[in-house]
Amino acid sequence: MNADREHQCDVLVIGSGAAGLSLALQVAQYGKVIVLSKGPRSEGATFYAQGGIAAVFDESDSIESHVQDTLIAGAGICDEQTVRFIAEHAKECVQWLIDGGVPFDKEEDSDNDHPRYHLTREGGHSHRRILHAADATGMAMQTSLQDNAHNHPNITVLERHNALDLITEDKIGGDANKVVGAYVWNRNAEHVETIRAKFVVLATGGASKVYQYTSNPDVSSGDGIAMAWRAGCRVANLEFNQFHPTCLYHPEARNFLLTEALRGEGAYLRRPDGSRFMPDFDERAELAPRDIVARAIDFEMKRLGADCMYLDISHKPADFIEKHFPTIYSRLMDLGIDMTKEPIPIVPAAHYTCGGVMVNPQGQTDLKQLYAIGEVSYTGLHGANRMASNSLLECVVYAWSASQDIIAQLPNASMPESLPAWDESQVTCSDEEVVLQHNWHELRLFMWDYMGIVRTNKRLERAMRRIQLLQQETHEYYSNFRVSNNLLEMRNLLQVAELMVRCAMQRKESRGLHYTLDYPDQLAESGPTILVPEK
């Protein structure tokens, strides 16, 4: 094999957000790590996370309270053992971030020897327990983790490298249930490379790009879920896609999120005529969980035929708004919206994939040597609805847990033998990229219409028929033409879209983020929706 097309490492981490970099930094003391980043390192979802990270730092708060709030938000199908595991390890994992240089906001009267962090409150939380860095927590975390990874001699970050597929050991005459590496598309050189590794970690994020309106960056195309499924891993709860209630409605600002902390600090949701509507839907009003708020906004928009609703914090002092929400204030001013004086136009947008690849408390999947952490995984934490600021927490707790498991096994793990090169001998360069673009837009539009905030059996059946048609076209395309970024993402999004719809079809009730007009009630007993790939 061409030497520059084959790499090897102790641990291959696919994804460079909070989960991937946190794990890489912890295992790099014990072995060589390669981290793959689809685009520039700051392009993932972590960078755009505004709100914060939940952990019990206040004496009036308790781990039990964090557990109970999470279980309530998850609408009865969280895994309580997982919820407890994460809540109990939250403080030490957040402290690891602080020790690594993440500049969480402190109280004004705090001193360096005994820092007191400014804690905010968001929907579903009964106490103030959200640590944050102004309104750009994800950016602060990502920047700190990136700098630490960049300076670590045992970590190599390969930017603009997309994983195509996992390689199982049966490719070299071994165990089909053991992962030994991955085929990777080098977007700079435009060729496929092979990376073999003792352990592979999926930290690829979610799949919200499957929807027309999303708060996520362009890289959120479900790659890890699709690759794990093709390799033989079970997935769960993919019917539960969280729609963030408040994404800015503006032609020049696609996917700009307006953090939940705005409502936590007193912002109201209003109709175009200025009247509030959340008290009509839930006694918690604007502080109700996201699924309830998103559905209320969707209902009011459809009822009134309105393009958007409005988020209004202008009744708060201007200096309070500018201090607590500097990023949002600045961005809105650039767009001609002064949030200290006028309401902000908003719509719901696909935001977070609550289901994913099934893992145990150490992040292990069904395949040996393969781990999944962060949004790509299904741990049981989120149940039918994710509570605000639990996602960054899940990233760092599972990064820690998986890293400990990998570190314990590294001394006895052997490097896989040389792997077969990617075969491009039967394919040609594409002359029909326009076909992919057309299929791409079609998929995102019908997923929004048929698999969106409100569903029916008929809508799900229509979505599945169209997915199968597009899968057939994309399979032919994949068989005949060389790899491209659009082709890889289209193939993966179609796979994940199919799994989402299959999960939704299996759930004969409305629960949390899954709301269907054909089964509007919640069953007395329920559990996760689990899909098993055919061997």
Swiss-Prot record:
A Pfam family reported for this protein in Swiss-Prot or TrEMBL: Succ_DH_flav_C
Q: Which reaction does it catalyse?
A: L-aspartate + O2 = iminosuccinate + H2O2
* Pathway per the UniProt entry: Cofactor biosynthesis; NAD(+) biosynthesis; iminoaspartate from L-aspartate (oxidase route): step 1/1
Task: Give its E.C. classification number.
Answer: 1.4.3.16
Active site residues per record: R290 (proton donor/acceptor)
- Where found, per UniProt? Cytoplasm
Cofactor, how bound (note): Binds 1 FAD per subunit.
Site Important in orienting the L-aspartate substrate — annotated at E122
Keyword Cytoplasm among UniProt keywords = yes
**Major subcellular site:** cytoplasm
Biological process GO terms, please? 'de novo' NAD biosynthetic process from L-aspartate
Superkingdom of this entry's organism? Bacteria
Instruction: Could you list this entry's UniProt keywords, alphabetically sorted.
Output: Cytoplasm, FAD, Flavoprotein, Nucleotide-binding, Oxidoreductase, Pyridine nucleotide biosynthesis
Give the InterPro entries listed for this entry.
FAD-dep_OxRdtase_2_FAD-bd (IPR003953), FAD/NAD-bd_sf (IPR036188), Fum_R/Succ_DH_flav-like_C_sf (IPR037099), Fum_Rdtase/Succ_DH_flav-like_C (IPR015939), NadB (IPR005288), Succ_DH/fumarate_Rdtase_cat_sf (IPR027477)
Q: Which cofactor does it need?
A: FAD
Q: Which GO terms describe its molecular function?
A: L-aspartate oxidase activity; nucleotide binding
The protein's name in its UniProt record: L-aspartate oxidase
Whichever gene encodes this chain, its name is nadB
